[in-house]
Amino acid sequence: MQVLNTMVNKHFLSLSVLIVLLGLSSNLTAGQVLFQGFNWESWKENGGWYNFLMGKVDDIAAAGITHVWLPPPSHSVGEQGYMPGRLYDLDASKYGNEAQLKSLIEAFHGKGVQVIADIVINHRTAEHKDGRGIYCLFEGGTPDSRLDWGPHMICRDDPYGDGTGNPDTGADFAAAPDIDHLNKRVQRELIGWLDWLKMDIGFDAWRLDFAKGYSADMAKIYIDATEPSFAVAEIWTSMANGGDGKPNYDQNAHRQELVNWVDRVGGANSNATAFDFTTKGILNVAVEGELWRLRGEDGKAPGMIGWWPAKATTFVDNHDTGSTQHLWPFPSDKVMQGYAYILTHPGNPCIFYDHFFDWGLKEEIERLVSIRNRQGIHPASELRIMEADSDLYLAEIDGKVITKIGPRYDVEHLIPEGFQVVAHGDGYAIWEKI
């Protein structure tokens, strides 16, 4: 990411905020460190989540975070925001109102932190029934007709809403009507809404929810038109498992899907990345006595970071896999081993709110982020895997940092001269070159 270009594009920022951003440029050149600023239950917070998170801005910024990911901002049938209806209506969000959201974004900007909006545009819930009694009439949340759609904006092969639009370009979302992204009016009005979120509300970047629900070609249209400073797509597909229920050693097909998506959206010329679900799935199992999984057949990392690290956004858990949903949780007693991996390795690491604030891991995570920033580890850093056995994973990053994961202690003979331990915890240790 080029910080100066980002700041030029953000012409709505005040001069004082630009000065703060310039002061943090040394951190930003090391690459993004993302922070998911909510969980599945955040909407329940008394007084509103936006107001609550305002009290965490200083801690998040001080930790070296460059981007904070906020929940879907619009009116939604589902409290968490993932069943959106009136897209322009930010006052109906369970997280707070539009004014509170703008104040929160301004507070993050004042600390040099960019803000990612959770963009849910694969599907949408209707506001009214038509004359046949079918819910297929949508309201945009403005006095005019923007985003006021009918059944012709719904994919005709979708089971909801009796749609008459084009066929779906991606996977079906079972809980709500899938939007016809081939429709030019849909494209035009969604781009207008995204531009409004960026220019009027203050968002800098996008997280694309359920991005497998529409083609990468459609995602490219929205990203190219709105020019976010950063974008990350959720493309969560099933891994290939063996008879024991564990992931197969070879997950090339799984990570190829992620690489293909990024390539179609624009590749190296785009700010788009994808969540590295391949690394997530392998790491989940590897820390349970199978650390050999962390070296692929080619000697490189087995996830997306082994093929295209600059375009991989790594994570340990999120509001779906962890939190109260617990759909694919990381082993709870080994979470810091997961962070030791993603925060010292190539890729764009994302820290989960729960682990940082609720699990008592704040200081340990901060220490790892500090090492990453101090040593200039970036999304495309060079990774050399030194050992990968059942009880030991040892890797050198950029010739400056060595990461050890696993219970084995007798590793000093494997550490080159000129390195010293700078962080350690249950099942992990980090060395820096002196």
Curated annotation (Swiss-Prot):
The keyword Metal-binding applies. InterPro entries: A-amylase_bs_C, A-amylase_pln, Alpha_amylase, Glyco_hydro_13_cat_dom, Glyco_hydro_b, Glycoside_hydrolase_SF. Binds 3 Ca(2+) ions per subunit. Ca(2+) 2 binds at E139, T142, D144, D148. One of its GO terms (molecular function) is alpha-amylase activity. It catalyses: Endohydrolysis of (1->4)-alpha-D-glucosidic linkages in polysaccharides containing three or more (1->4)-alpha-linked D-glucose units. Its EC number is 3.2.1.1. SMART domains: Aamy, Alpha-amyl_C2. Keywords: Calcium, Carbohydrate metabolism, Glycoprotein, Glycosidase, Hydrolase, Metal-binding, Signal. The active site is at D209, E234. Ca(2+) 3 binds at D158, D172, F173, A176, D178. Only cereal amylase known to be glycosylated. Its cofactor is Ca(2+). GO terms for biological process: starch catabolic process; sucrose catabolic process. The keyword Metal-binding applies. More abundant in germinating seeds, than in callus, young roots and leaves. The record marks D320 as: Transition state stabilizer. Glycans are attached at N271. Pfam families: Alpha-amyl_C2, Alpha-amylase. Substrate binds at residues 75-77, 82-83, 207-212, 236, 238, 256, 263, 300, 306-308, 319, 325, 404, 409-411, 421-427, 431. Important for breakdown of endosperm starch during germination. Binds starch not only at the active site, but also via accessory binding sites on the protein surface that are important for efficient binding to starch granules and thereby increase enzyme activity. Monomer. Belongs to the glycosyl hydrolase 13 family. This is Alpha-amylase. It comes from Oryza sativa subsp. japonica (Rice). The gene is AMY1.1.
